[in-house]
Amino acid sequence: MANASPLSPTNQHFFQPLLPGFQSNLKIPVNYFSEHIEGKHEGKTVTLRTDASERTWEVKMEGHRLTEGWKEFVEAHDLRIGDFVVFRHEGDMVFHVTALGPSCCEIQYPQSSRHEEGEESGENEISEKEGEENVQKESDKSSSDLNCFSQSVTHSNISRDAVSVPRDFVKRSGFSKGRHEIVLMNEEGKSWESEVKSYMSGAVYLVGGWTTFCTENKLDVGDSCTFKLLQKAKTPVFQLCSRTKHLPLSFTKVNGLINPGKIILVDKDRAEWSMMLKVDSRGAVYIIGGNDWKSFCAANEVGAGESLALELIQGGVLLNQITTCFQMEQPSFKAEDGRHKRARVQNRSQETDKGAETSRASTMGPKLEITEKGEPSRASTMRPKVEIREKIAETGEPSRASNKSSGIEGNLQHTKPCSVKTDQLAKVKESVVDTLTSIGRFQAELETMKRKLEDSLQELN
């Protein structure tokens, strides 16, 4: 059977779209049934298997319909209206079933606990352990306990409104069996109803509310989010861990960053990212950027665990709203471990007269050094027209501060307003073209599907 040719009778295929009512039974196409099953097999049951688990399902066949046992197969694989199933006959009434989502892409299920003999099994187990260790490391970064798990947003889990839950988290938290109502909660306390559901294949999914949660919290495909389990409430709560960036309190007080407002991050190429300053009830100031912060770090090669020095040039305050501009600049030397980054933070005054430049330069504050934890190490009063720089060393040790030269002052006075690069427009244009191409491809797939459904309808008539 393993050596059968793809064109041999034992490898004949048929597929069916899942329409309303499919949960109770599934029809085998008349032509396929008459050519490959009718009169050639005495058995009244078929065996179904998938790549989702080692288990097989015995399903009763009444005429050319799959009936008793089909519902259990559907529930085990979370099949839904709009999905497609492809059956490959492997001989002796054994069918391998592949499930496709509405996007016509194969549905991916978490690997089950398969313990086959031989070298291949060993490799699978190692790979699985490594995956669990990676998830554990991500959790450790976000919380001091083990009640966290991380997951990425994908096209598949968005379209299916369901996302898999890591196996190690499931074991720790007791969600490995049955169905459990839960609540998804964002950083601001807004909640969405959902549930954790386990399947016979061993897979555990967070089902319902996922797509809405991602949309309203501006989580895009490729983003990673970490949830912390709060079990004190009657219904378990999966709370999204903070994606904000905390600014040291000593730094914000000295520089008057005490009010919420809009900020714009600009790198050396003057590409812009819009962020917000948020002040909590304790007076702590955060940068909230979500995907924009992630894009900013990626564009400037700032990775997880790396230090980032911020350099603030004090500016004017307008309507109690501070508008700042972070300008990334490449250091003139390469750090010992290659991981130190520097950024310049420049306030943009909204005045348009020529005196704005002079006003901005004359309000420069003292130079402040802080450790990685945000604790002040040494501060000294400097002459006017110098920058306030926040340096964070990778090792957490305080760095030494020095006066900026007059050449730097000259550069500050000639800083140009933040602007969007032309290459960004090119990227937008390219994205639109790609979207139109995808739409055309999808329309072609719909036409093919339409013809097949019309053929099926003719068979029914």
Swiss-Prot record:
One of its GO terms (biological process) is response to cold. Residues 110-146, 333-415 are annotated as: Disordered. One of its GO terms (molecular function) is transcription cis-regulatory region binding. It is found in: Nucleus. Residues 400-415 have a biased composition (Polar residues). Pfam families: B3. Residues 126-143, 384-394 have a biased composition (Basic and acidic residues). The keyword Cell inner membrane does not apply. Keywords: DNA-binding, Nucleus, Repeat, Transcription, Transcription regulation. Its main location: nucleus. InterPro entries: B3_DNA-bd (IPR003340), DNA-bd_pseudobarrel_sf (IPR015300), REM_fam (IPR039218). Residues 11-103, 148-244, 230-332 bind DNA. One of its GO terms (cellular component) is nucleus. SUPFAM superfamilies: DNA-binding pseudobarrel domain. SMART domains: B3. This is B3 domain-containing protein REM9. It comes from Arabidopsis thaliana (Mouse-ear cress).
